[in-house]
Swiss-Prot record:
Assembly and interaction partners: Interacts with GIR1 and GIR2.
Phenotypic effect of disruption: Defect in trichome development. Defect in accumulation of seed coat mucilage. Excessive root hair formation. High seed oil content phenotype.
GO CC, one annotated term: nucleus
Induction record: Down-regulated by GEM.
Provenance organism: Arabidopsis thaliana (Mouse-ear cress)
Superkingdom per UniProt: Eukaryota
Annotated SMART domains: HOX, START
Compositionally biased region (Acidic residues): 73-90
Localisation: Nucleus
START domain residues: 250-489
The keyword Protein biosynthesis is annotated on this UniProt entry: no
Protein name: Homeobox-leucine zipper protein GLABRA 2
The keyword Coiled coil appears for this protein: yes
Gene from which this protein is expressed: GL2
Coiled coil: 155-223
């Protein structure tokens, strides 16, 4: 039995992105350094002991009491006892039966245990030099020290397993209670309508009336009666104004929709694999640009399908390696819930409007076609969202290659002017080619091709939107890579100590990461221009433009109940995105800008890595003042396109329970934070960067700050101007502090 302790739990965590091919050792996935050879030894029980200095450290949930190990004298005593027993056995016939001598054990003193416990907390796997030094200090043999640490690690593992088992039992009991409650509710629902209380006869009568009205509408429109199967959950609801027109898609034969999808798949493959002259590389930016004349020569039907009056075509292509196998990745695109979660910063609403055709194979995705809706957003309220309806299909091109194809379908013989007025964004054949590489990795080649109507965009973001960077392929690929990387770190069971400081259990690590992810997704919903919120533009006394929205929380247990106000402001800063991101992450500089700290210094309690980049991390920080201590949960994320820093004050007692592995779902969090995006200008002079060499090679940053405040715990309370001014003043003070700290007050 090996004494090396891992952090694997009794039951692996189930995740829809889990892949058997994924390596759950972060060191094995992300670090290519060659590991040194290990020299296995055997302890006094004949077990193998590996003294590998570059091993990961076990996580324990608690410390046990004093332990004891067997000394050299014990071992020598055991050998001596064996000899005496042999002599006694040889003389058994003459002297009768003799009692076997008891083996001696050596109990360490309290002082010895205290010193070894102190070293164990710092280094559970001491090297030879540390063991020698400790043995001399405590008057013990090196083997005694070695065996004590070995036994201590075994105890820690047993404690951890018992703790995780208790958590699993509690979760099982909770699921049983929920199942029982659902069965009872279903039995009640079968006897009466949950909304009006009517019986089954009333429901059948109402259903017949609705069917009759639907048949009349179909007869008037001359449509074939294809069923409309919407799959919109509460968090995926969307405005159906433009759907009044788009239901004309169902007048098309399904074979016609399949034909359009097949043609779009061929076009996507061509767009993804072609080089020059279809794609040309920009000398100024280094990005690929679509040669539209060459595109129309290759696909002449694209000109005929274009809407009149549309003058903006956005086309981009990018590729990258993601940490997920191709099949799992394809499945996530065909599940609207997983798709929305994967691209939470880009998609505010999503729904499957209808399933045109079921797929084949075990997972039923190969050949699947479905009509979908999505509302795309940027993390700022000043850029309008884009609503788009499209047909998505999934094709397995080869055993190792999949294609996810999106295309908006136009209805023949329809009023194109009405269509253009309702649908301001259309997808020309777009999507991604996913190719399995090895060890759970995939290469994703993304093509984003949009036909959008001209819209008014604030000058601050105009360059970013007009160049196609805002909703382009680079943004989608970078977001996908970050999400898959986070999942790998979340599922990992063998985590180095430096990647999980301050959290000693695997269950605690996962609970903290879950709480941080929920906080960040809540921030995404709060900051964008989605129709979830109604933003009002105001101008502060200092002349700063600001957007303000308010909402009432009645039922969400994850947020405080009452009236919540969000104030947001966007501005350009002559600072590189990387430097600005590091500034907000640094707890040593938090007191320079955060009004919550009130000038007090901040210390980090825990820091969990969730990606290869050191900036992708979750931290719990404490702000100590004379009156009280405040804990702040901070989630930092960065990729090649954008960076986000989200934070929120959290209750100390409940957060301590989360650190111990408790469920964080119902902990109230009201997040604020920053979104940092490159300004779209590849080279701008006089920009502050982290190094002097990069001063003229990087652009500035588009910073969006959003602060949320609970102004009244009563949902019935009315919003007043004093409360709004207090929030907007806080935003103004924070922005002023940021400029002063970065020495750019003139901007």
């Amino acid at each position: 039995m090996s004494m090396a302790v891992d952090m694997s739990s009794k039951q692996p965590t189930k995740d829809f992105f889990s892949s058997p091919a994924l390596s759950l050792s972060l060191a094995g996935i992300f670090r290519n350094a060659s590991s040194g050879s290990t020299n296995p030894e055997e302890d006094f029980l004949g077990r193998r002991v590996v003294d590998d200095e570059d091993r990961t450290v076990e996580m324990s949930s608690e410390n046990s009491g004093p332990t004891r190990s067997r000394s050299e004298e014990d071992l020598e005593g055991e050998d001596h006892d064996d000899e005496e027993e042999e002599e006694e056995d040889g003389a058994a016939g003459n002297k009768g039966t003799n009692k076997r001598k008891r083996k001696k054990y050596h109990r360490h003193t309290t002082d010895q245990i205290r010193h070894m416990e102190a070293l164990f907390k710092e280094t559970p796997h001491p090297d030879e030099k540390q063991r020698q030094q400790l043995s001399k200090q405590l008057g013990l043999a090196p083997r005694q020290v070695k065996f004590w640490f070995q036994n201590r690690r075994t105890q820690i593992k047993a404690i951890q397993e018992r703790h995780e088992n208790s958590l699993l039992k509690a979760e099982l009991e909770k699921l049983r209670e929920e199942n029982k409650a659902m069965r009872e509710s279903f039995s009640k629902a079968n006897s009466s309508c949950p909304n009006c209380g009517g019986g089954p006869d009333d429901l059948h009568l109402e259903n017949s009336k609705l069917k009759a009205e639907l048949d009349k509408l179909r007869a008037a429109l001359g449509r074939t009666p294809y069923p409309l199967q919407a799959s919109c959950s509460d968090d995926q609801e969307h405005r159906l104004g433009s759907l009044d027109f788009y239901t004309g898609v169902f007048a098309l034969e399904k074979s016609r929709i399949a034909e359009i999808s097949n043609r779009a798949t061929l076009e996507l493959q061509k767009m993804a694999t072609s080089g020059e002259p279809m794609w040309l590389r920009s000398v100024e930016t280094g990005r690929e640009i679509l040669n539209y004349d060459e595109y129309l020569k290759e696909f002449p039907q694209a000109q005929a399908s274009s809407f009149p009056g549309r003058k903006t075509i956005e086309a981009s292509r990018d590729a990258g390696i993601v940490f997920m196998d191709a099949h799992k990745l394809a499945q996530s695109f065909m599940d609207v819930g997983q798709w929305k979660e994967t691209f939470a910063c880009l998609i505010s609403k999503a729904a499957t409007v209808d399933v045109i055709r079921q797929g084949e194979g075990p997972s039923r995705i190969d050949g699947a076609i479905q009509l979908m809706f999505g509302e795309m957003q940027l993390l700022t309220p000043v850029v309008p969202t884009r609503e788009v309806y499209f047909v998505r299909s999934c094709r397995q091109l080869s055993p190792e290659k999949w294609a996810i194809v999106d295309v908006s379908v136009s209805v023949e013989d329809s009023n194109t002017e009405k269509e253009a007025s309702l649908l301001k964004c259309r997808k020309l054949p777009s999507g991604c080619i996913i190719e399995d590489t090895s060890n759970g990795h995939s290469k994703v080649t993304w093509v984003e091709h949009l036909d959008v109507s001209a819209s008014t965009v604030q000058p601050l973001f105009r360059s970013l939107v007009n160049t196609g960077l805002a909703f382009g392929a680079r943004h989608w690929v970078a977001t996908l890579q970050l999400h898959c990387e986070r999942l790998v770190f979340f599922m990992a069971t063998n985590v180095p100590t430096k990647d999980s400081l301050g959290v000693t259990t695997l269950a605690g690590r996962k609970s903290v990461l879950k709480m941080a992810q929920r906080m960040t997704q809540s921030f995404y919903r709060a900051i964008a221009a989605s129709s979830y919120h109604q933003w009002t533009k105001i101008t502060t006394k200092t002349g700063q433009d600001m957007r303000v929205s308010s909402r009432k929380n009645l039922h969400d247990p994850g947020e405080p109940t009452g009236v919540i106000v969000c104030a947001s402001s966007s501005l350009w800063l002559p600072v590189s995105p990387a430097l600005l991101f590091d500034f907000f992450r640094d707890e040593a500089r938090r007191h320079e800008w955060d009004a919550l700290s009130n000038g007090a210094h901040v210390q980090s309690i825990a820091n969990l890595s969730k990606g290869q980049d050191r900036g992708n991390s979750v931290a719990i920080q404490t702000v100590k003042s004379r009156e009280k201590s405040i804990w702040v949960l901070q989630d930092s994320s960065t990729n090649s396109y954008e960076s986000v820093v989200v934070y929120a004050p959290v209750d100390i007692n409940t957060t301590q329970l989360v650190l111990a592995g408790h469920d964080p779902s119902n902990i109230q969090i009201l997040p604020s934070g920053f979104s940092i995006i490159p300004d779209g200008v590849e080279s701008r002079p006089l920009v502050i960067t982290s190094t002097q060499d990069d001063r003229n090679s990087q652009g500035g940053s588009l910073l969006t700050l959003a602060l949320q405040t609970l102004i009244n715990p009563s949902p019935a309370a009315k919003l007043n101007m004093e409360s709004v001014e207090s929030v907007t003043n806080l935003v103004s003070v924070t922005l002023h502090n940021i400029k002063r700290s970065l020495q750019i007050e003139d901007c």
